Amino acid sequence: MRVHFRWTTAYFIALLLLQVPAIEADQPTPVSPSTQNTPIAAQLLGTWRLVAVTEEEGGRVIPSPDYGLHPAGYLMYDSTGHVCVQLMNTTRPKWKDGDVPTPDEARSAILGFGGYCGRYEIHAAEHYVVHFPEADLWPNDIGQALKRTFELSGDRLVLKAVERRPSDGRLTTNIITWTRVK
């Protein structure tokens, strides 16, 4: 417990020292008109469960080396223009020493997890959505525009994005498949 308290305290001190702007809950978040009142928006709203994370490289589609064959996660779009997504590799090793990971265990935990929350905009005619992370595991993504093309078919949603793989920096097309939670 003491180590967990130290990490939590260090995290909040770092936020204060870096003067990270607070996200005020009572301030309205700007929502793009493209996000509201469209048939596509109505179809995207709700909670989605992760089915698969694959990569396309050189015409081949392979399971993501970072998230594995059986990833877990959720994606949520709400009617106020907010998105929250978390995905993880279910085979990440547990830490042998409880709350204190070895460097390899910490690396595996970080590279096998992805998550952020923020705003989103839908560009229905062009079949893409843009996520604007406000809180993100990857600090460099905060404030960026993350474009994902989408395909909707019934209760299935496929998001695609060209991105760098966290583990080795190579550019790949990520294909993330979701199913609607009912």
Regions found by a protein language model. Give the residues of each.
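Bacterial N-terminal signal peptides
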Residues: 9-21
